[in-house]
């Protein structure tokens, strides 16, 4: 029986033997291929656009807030992030109430937000940098002017973000004040300029207050060109609700406060305004008292881009100028990622055209604020627009007479 089984398996064994005897042709691989030479290719990995630490437009990072005594590379224009939201307010100790059984009552305060709609602007600086990742200083030549401001006279750097606490808004603003003070006191790279200029990436619009305090320290009161859908000159007793002085400092009252502190001139102007007011007459009276004129959003249809530019230039002529751009000046179709969106705004092209038309003004500071990336669409429409607005603001600074 065993012999029969062996005889039956014998053909199969012959097959296995034959398989082992098969000789395959030599594999054509690395041994027969010419290796591409790796030397003398001039490969440069120092300017990778999508690698390394993210900075605005892939600019060099400088630790502008380095401790005293540590050397910092001189620069002329600095990008400074302000990751700040006036939300989750914690009241001052003397404002805390107690109920009849001694339990702390915080609901009245904790339910109050400093932003009037959606929070999230603290992530604006990182979002704007993300939107600028396609920009490279060596390849930023304007199709309109044939110029590249990144390779002009100014050394432009990204200082990163100011380290701001997210637990105490009052302390965070003091930190931002200090950050602006340090950065603006750094030595310039150009011998023709004594003070670096700062472009702030917000953050909610309250951050502009720290920037204006900084510009006042070096240049005195400035005219403000304020691109926004809201006035932002509201009396703190109106928008803050009269709850406390602490609650009255927010992104809708900062221009009122700046006026009270003597930081801005009575030659300032809004552009793109269209949001409802809290008081039909009182808000406008207070706005005039704070030194502002208004270009309403729909007036761009009446006067055109050239007409808007002319009004802005006429209003701030022969003064030092700070430009503040709330991204909600754009229609939500072009910038959905913002805290308090208002329909009926400008297009991205209209805003950029107006900004570029301000060339020749003495711009000494600027910001882009209220970008809340969490509400953006998959195409990142808002952060792309904000990044390009920053580019235009840098251009105005480079071409500024001082």
Question: What is each PLM-predicted segment?
Answer:
Residues 20-106, 110-402:
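Conserved alpha-helical scaffold segments that buttress catalytic/binding sites
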Residues 1-20:
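Fungal secretory targeting signals
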């Amino acid at each position: 029986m065993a012999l029969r089984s062996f005889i039956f398996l014998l053909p199969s064994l012959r097959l296995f033997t034959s398989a082992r005897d098969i000789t395959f042709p030599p594999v054509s691989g690395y041994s027969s291929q010419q290796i591409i030479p790796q030397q003398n290719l001039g490969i440069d990995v120092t300017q990778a656009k999508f690698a390394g630490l993210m900075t605005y437009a892939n600019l060099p990072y400088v630790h502008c807030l380095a401790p005293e005594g540590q050397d910092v590379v001189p620069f002329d224009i600095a990008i400074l992030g302000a990751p700040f939201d006036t939300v989750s307010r914690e009241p001052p100790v003397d404002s805390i109430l107690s109920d009849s059984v001694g339990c702390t009552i915080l609901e009245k305060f904790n339910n109050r937000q400093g932003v009037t709609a959606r929070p999230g602007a603290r992530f604006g600086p990182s979002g704007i940098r993300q939107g600028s990742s396609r920009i490279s200083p060596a390849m930023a030549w304007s199709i309109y002017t044939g110029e590249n401001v990144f390779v002009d006279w100014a050394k432009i750097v990204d200082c990163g973000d100011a380290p701001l606490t997210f637990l105490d808004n009052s302390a965070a603003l003091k930190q931002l004040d200090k950050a602006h003070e340090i950065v603006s006191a750094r030595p310039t790279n150009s011998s023709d300029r004594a003070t670096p200029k700062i472009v702030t990436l917000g953050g909610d619009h309250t951050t502009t207050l720290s920037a204006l305090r900084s510009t006042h320290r070096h240049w005195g009161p400035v005219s403000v060109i304020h691109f926004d859908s809201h006035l932002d000159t509201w009396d703190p007793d109106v928008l803050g609700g009269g709850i406390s002085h602490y609650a009255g400092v927010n992104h809708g009252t900062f221009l009122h406060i700046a006026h009270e502190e003597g930081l801005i001139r009575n030659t300032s102007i809004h552009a793109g305004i269209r949001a409802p007011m809290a008081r039909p007459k009182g808000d406008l009276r207070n706005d005039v008292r704070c030194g502002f004129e208004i270009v309403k959003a729909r007036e761009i249809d009446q006067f055109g881009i050239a007409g808007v530019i002319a009004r802005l230039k006429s209003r701030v002529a022969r003064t030092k100028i700070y430009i503040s751009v709330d991204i909600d000046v754009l229609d939500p179709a072009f910038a959905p990622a913002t805290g308090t969106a208002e329909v009926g705004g400008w297009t991205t092209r209209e805003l950029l055209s107006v900004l570029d038309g301000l060339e020749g003004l003495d711009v000494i500071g600027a910001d882009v604020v209220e970008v809340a990336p969490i509400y953006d669409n998959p195409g990142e429409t808002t952060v792309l627009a904000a990044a390009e607005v920053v580019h235009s603001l840098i251009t105005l600074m480079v071409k500024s007479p001082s």
